[in-house]
């Protein structure tokens, strides 16, 4: 094997365990809230990386540095405990190595304790099934399992999402552990400030060395109300703690219910 082939093989070996963090269509800690039955909701996720990783996480992947991701997340409240979601389209309006791309789509099912905001302890489970282009993920089909647990200790909220991701290779031991968490202070029923963390430890059968793990801390602000055309708004700035993380990332999430009166098929 020549030197170039050896280097490429080594790169793939170390990049593959973190490939599921190559890019993301959403940067969000789930709080167990779902759309009311019969209500459609649309959320637009905007993520921009002004200073990030400058090499692809696997051969052919979108480069994170200076990339901009936009995803439309459609949701429909089926019952008080079940919300059906669809992410489409998942796009990158800009990346340095591909320009503008459509990256795939994703279906999700979110099961939650009804009226989670009214309970001190709440819980939920989210399941996602993704179809990806090769530059977005190294595998065409990937999935996420996201348990959700949290406490409403007014005015504080504490939420943890112990997420596992899979590309359906390597069995249970190759599940990727990518948890996220959030601690929020609610000034009132409209405004909140929060600290968030997003992590990627690697496969369950053996976590990666710390330098190769993904760890970002975030400061976010949240608004929900009717002042801005009925929009709920979340903004945030994230800072990477390891060399495998993006140094700076920005996010903007805009969401709105699309109907007032419940609709049933």
Language-model features: locations:
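Transmembrane beta-barrel domains of Gram-negative outer membranes and organellar outer membranes
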Residues: 22-265
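Cleavable N-terminal export/targeting peptides
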Residues: 1-26, 261-265
């Amino acid at each position: 094997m020549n030197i170039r082939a050896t280097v490429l093989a080594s790169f793939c070996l170390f990049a593959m365990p973190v490939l599921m963090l190559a890019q993301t269509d959403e940067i969000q800690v789930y709080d167990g809230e779902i759309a009311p039955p019969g209500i459609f909701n649309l959320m637009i996720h905007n993520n921009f990386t002004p200073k990030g990783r400058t090499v692809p996480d696997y051969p052919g992947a979108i480069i994170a540095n200076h990339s901009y991701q936009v995803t439309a997340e459609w949701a429909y409240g089926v019952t008080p405990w079940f919300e059906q979601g669809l992410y489409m389209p998942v796009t990158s309006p800009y990346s340095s190595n591909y320009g503008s791309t459509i990256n795939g789509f994703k279906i999700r099912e979110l099961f939650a304790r009804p009226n989670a905001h009214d309970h001190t302890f709440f819980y939920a489970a989210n399941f996602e099934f993704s179809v990806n282009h090769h530059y977005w993920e190294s595998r065409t089909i990937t999935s996420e399992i996201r348990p959700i647990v949290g406490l409403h200790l007014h005015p504080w909220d504490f939420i943890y999402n112990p997420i596992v991701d899979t590309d359906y290779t390597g069995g249970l031991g190759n599940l990727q552990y990518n948890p996220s968490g959030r601690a929020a202070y609610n000034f009132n029923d409209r405004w909140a400030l929060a600290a968030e963390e997003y992590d990627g430890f690697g496969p369950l059968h053996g976590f990666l060395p710390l330098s190769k793990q993904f760890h970002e801390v975030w400061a976010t602000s949240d608004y929900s109300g009717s002042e801005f055309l009925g929009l709920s708004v979340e903004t945030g700035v994230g800072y990477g703690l390891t060399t495998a993380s993006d140094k700076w990332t920005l996010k903007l999430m805009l969401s709105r219910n699309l109907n007032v009166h419940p609709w049933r098929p």
